[in-house]
Amino acid sequence: MPDAVKVGFVPFATPARGTLIVFCDDGLKFGATATKALGAAVATVKRAAATAQFKGKSGSAMDLLAPEGLKVGRLIVVGAGKVASINDYDLLKLGGAVAGKIGAGDTAVTVVADLPTGAMKPEQAAAIASGIRLRAYKFDRYKTKKKDDENGAANASVTLAVADPAAAKKAFTPDSHVVDGVILARELVNEPPNVLYPEEFAKRAAQLKKLGVEVQILDVKAMTQLKMGALLGVSQGSAHPGRTVIMRWNGGKKGEQPLAFVGKGVCFDTGGISIKPSASMEDMKGDMGGAACVVGLMHALAARKAKVNAVGAIGLVENMPDGNAQRPGDIVTSMSGQTIEIINTDAEGRLVLADVLWYVAQKHKPKFMVDLATLTGAIMVALGTEYAGLFSNNDQLAERLAAVGQSTGEKVWRMPLGPEYDKQIDSQFADMKNTGSRNGGSITAAQFLQRFVDGTPWAHLDIAGTAMASPKNEINQSWGSGYGVRLLNQLVAEYYEAKK
């Protein structure tokens, strides 16, 4: 993985060099271990806090250089807010706040993992460590000249002083694999489109074989034999042929129904013949955020050896305008046999998903399918960049996604489906058309997808506002967020994974 930050766990001992980081609550109270670490410097910290009007609000920080009474070169006090009600996501963000304060010169950092309520539990320390790694990630491989202060936490060695290092390390190991999955998803979204085209994306997904994932790549010939006319129609205008990648992790009981996750992978979207405006078209390299999430999720499940059977499927295309490109007015036949009139070639993601959803439903007979797609600008108008749109034909699945959305901070908001919306995509010339009216655009897109799930319990996550170019936050400073990996990993772990 590209992040170079090293995170470890050690028994507590007051450091004699480097940077010391301690937590306080919103009353400027410290835990017993932090108080011991500060020693006589507690009075100095209190005076500095009064001068700086530092209150210990969650995520805030106060910085003291060469603090009197300590041997370290730098002391950072990070506010944890109201610690009595602190949860795992709060701790993840707190870890991000720690990473955000680490500078390029902080090569050795000690974080005292306790709060006024007591020493952090192993799982809490692991959440801090995960937040540090998530925040420290940077995508800068194409920069040939870097400023001295650009690396920050990425090159630091961070140790968390904990009550039980072995237990903390054990708790962090599976969490670290999930972080790896998030970072992998971010890497894929951040890559330029001249580097990450469908064939290259498929090759990177195939690297999951090293973790024990079965990977099958369908090329144009194979997809033609399967009659995937909807997906192939999108890719026919590109010099880079499309691919469908099927990944399978068999960590559950033999013969047990798998869970299925499907991702839209439009590696670059010009809009095709219905071409987009040039302004911000460069962002369309991220139109494969759903596919990136699925690959990152499969990495996480396999690396942590999740006790579940799971299928990940991604449809990979470029949507380009050339003499062979799909036209408005064309009618294509999907793998399901249903025909689709093309009204707008820029409504291409649903065409890709249509064939992949049908393939997975028919071939793997999953317990449920969750698809992720940067599908519509309409969902951003409705929900902004804080929530993904959730559409589902199954209340239990929707409720579970909403619950883990709250606990992980990768929030979803359920949107309606219904026959009144569905009839808007009926076509005069084919079974359906690929767009409805301007009104309710994200809903009619989801209605289109529902026609290809064949009755399988299903949820659609429209992640157009959350997968890329979303606001930077405590645990992500990257253009690509890796949204969905933690959400779906938690869904699996909490509701579907065999317990030990």
Curated annotation (Swiss-Prot):
<feature type="active site">
    <location>
        <position position="276"/>
    </location>
</feature>
<keyword id="KW-0479">Metal-binding</keyword>
<dbReference type="GO" id="GO:0030145">
    <property type="term" value="F:manganese ion binding"/>
</dbReference>
<feature type="binding site">
    <location>
        <position position="264"/>
    </location>
    <ligand>
        <name>Mn(2+) 2</name>
    </ligand>
</feature>
<feature type="active site">
    <location>
        <position position="350"/>
    </location>
</feature>
<dbReference type="GO" id="GO:0006508">
    <property type="term" value="P:proteolysis"/>
</dbReference>
<dbReference type="Pfam" id="PF02789">
    <property type="entry name" value="Peptidase_M17_N"/>
</dbReference>
<feature type="binding site">
    <location>
        <position position="269"/>
    </location>
    <ligand>
        <name>Mn(2+) 2</name>
    </ligand>
</feature>
<comment type="function">
    <text>Presumably involved in the processing and regular turnover of intracellular proteins. Catalyzes the removal of unsubstituted N-terminal amino acids from various peptides.</text>
</comment>
<dbReference type="InterPro" id="IPR023042">
    <property type="entry name" value="Peptidase_M17_leu_NH2_pept"/>
</dbReference>
<feature type="binding site">
    <location>
        <position position="346"/>
    </location>
    <ligand>
        <name>Mn(2+) 1</name>
    </ligand>
</feature>
<keyword id="KW-0378">Hydrolase</keyword>
<feature type="binding site">
    <location>
        <position position="269"/>
    </location>
    <ligand>
        <name>Mn(2+) 1</name>
    </ligand>
</feature>
<protein>
    <recommendedName>
        <fullName>Probable cytosol aminopeptidase</fullName>
        <ecNumber>3.4.11.1</ecNumber>
        <ecNumber>3.4.11.10</ecNumber>
    </recommendedName>
</protein>
<feature type="binding site">
    <location>
        <position position="348"/>
    </location>
    <ligand>
        <name>Mn(2+) 1</name>
    </ligand>
</feature>
<dbReference type="Pfam" id="PF00883">
    <property type="entry name" value="Peptidase_M17"/>
</dbReference>
<comment type="similarity">
    <text>Belongs to the peptidase M17 family.</text>
</comment>
<dbReference type="InterPro" id="IPR011356">
    <property type="entry name" value="Leucine_aapep/pepB"/>
</dbReference>
<feature type="binding site">
    <location>
        <position position="348"/>
    </location>
    <ligand>
        <name>Mn(2+) 2</name>
    </ligand>
</feature>
<keyword id="KW-0031">Aminopeptidase</keyword>
<keyword id="KW-0464">Manganese</keyword>
<dbReference type="GO" id="GO:0005737">
    <property type="term" value="C:cytoplasm"/>
</dbReference>
<keyword id="KW-0645">Protease</keyword>
<feature type="binding site">
    <location>
        <position position="287"/>
    </location>
    <ligand>
        <name>Mn(2+) 2</name>
    </ligand>
</feature>
<dbReference type="GO" id="GO:0070006">
    <property type="term" value="F:metalloaminopeptidase activity"/>
</dbReference>
<dbReference type="InterPro" id="IPR008283">
    <property type="entry name" value="Peptidase_M17_N"/>
</dbReference>
<dbReference type="InterPro" id="IPR000819">
    <property type="entry name" value="Peptidase_M17_C"/>
</dbReference>
<keyword id="KW-0963">Cytoplasm</keyword>
<dbReference type="InterPro" id="IPR043472">
    <property type="entry name" value="Macro_dom-like"/>
</dbReference>
